[in-house]
Amino acid sequence: MKSGRINMRILYIQYTNPAGYPPLQHGSRILAENGFKVLFLGTGARGAAALEFPPHPNVNLRRLTFCPAGWRQKLHYGLFTLWVLFWVLRWRPRWIYASDCLSCPVAALLSLVPAVRIIYHEHDSPNGTLDKSSSISERFVRSIRGLVAQRANLCILPNQRRAESFKERTRTERLVLNVWNCPSSKEVKERSSRSDSFVLFFHGSIVPARLPMAIVEALAKLPTEVVLRVAGYETIGHSGYIQALQNYASKLGIGHRLSFLGSFVHRDTLLENCSHADVGLALMPLKTADINEQAMTGASNKPFDYLACGLALLVSELAEWKKMFVDPGYGLACDPGDPDSIAKQLLWFLQHPVETRSMGIKGRQRILSEWNYETQFSPVLQAIGAKGVQD
């Protein structure tokens, strides 16, 4: 680069499919609309392999094929590292935007490159502390995570509790921002006219913690006009769970009221389907040892997406969730493990259509005014501007 020339290139790296992460889609698009050239380097992903970013002239995505766990994956990661280094030398980005722990070894190497600056965005935090049972690779990645946190120009986490834990565990003195996983304001939709059915909607990874069997049992307790539509994918750890849900629904005689829509390639299609529903399900277990499940307000994009489509919310009876979504009047709370508790709240929605619709309208207004990614991401833009992009 010639002295004085503005370098507006940012390289995103993530050892999975970046298109499975809405905040990356929104953030990269905001940067692209502010003049940045954006390149994503990632891999395929089981379950989320079909997901894609919408096209944008300033955003490009390249991926290696997916490699399952095992010794081949270690070689695959080495290849990924070399591939990223090649693109850094070829493309010469000013900023590296590294996502999650598995990007940290590569980001640590790139932090040694002169004039390259690092942004570290942790979508999912590692659980617990290291002990004798921890693998060598886990210890290595965790230690490198701390190094990246200390070298990065900026760190981003989607929840305040996670951000505080991150600062404490990594001992970083760098700027750490709390950026919620909100939808883009451009994704806000008018709720479609109501059909003859009362539609519940769920989207995301289809796992017991997010879509418990109790939901199916609750559905069986409700009038036949109540149906559940599920969009998303199974994870490696819960292969076969969709079939288990279908089998249970059939056993209860409500198989025709439970629909699996699969994964939509683009978010626009997902949100269009969402806008035809009445209530969005955003449930978390009441008790869990997982730090990510303990601290999901702001980090879970589900409730924000539902509100953007004008849906009322059904969330778990957790203090933070009730304060954020129930107290302002955007939905109701239940015990996600109790079919009777779930059914009681869903029946209230069914019997109070005017109030239910009002919840969705209020929530959509909150998305437009505050809970949108343009607002959430603005401190990141300011931080990048403060640090400069000029060589």
Feature-to-residue mapping (PLM):
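Nucleotide-sugar-dependent
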Residues: 22, 210, 266-273, 280-304, ...
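Nucleotide-activated donor-binding/catalytic signature segment of Leloir-type glycosyltransferases, i.e.
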Residues: 242-273, 279
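Conserved acidic donor-binding segment of nucleotide-sugar-dependent glycosyltransferases
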Residues: 300, 327-339, 348-354
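Donor nucleotide-sugar binding/catalytic pocket of nucleotide-sugar-dependent glycosyltransferases
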Residues: 42, 142-188, 195
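Membrane-proximal helix-turn-helix segments that form the acceptor-binding/catalytic region
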Residues: 29, 82-90, 105, 109-113, ...
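Conserved donor-binding/catalytic core segment of Leloir-type glycosyltransferases
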Residues: 11-13, 156, 192-219, 229-230
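N-terminal strand-loop element at the rim of the active site
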Residues: 14-19, 30-76, 161-167, 176-178, ...
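A short, well-ordered alpha-helix in the C-terminal region of glycosyltransferases
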Residues: 341, 348, 355-369
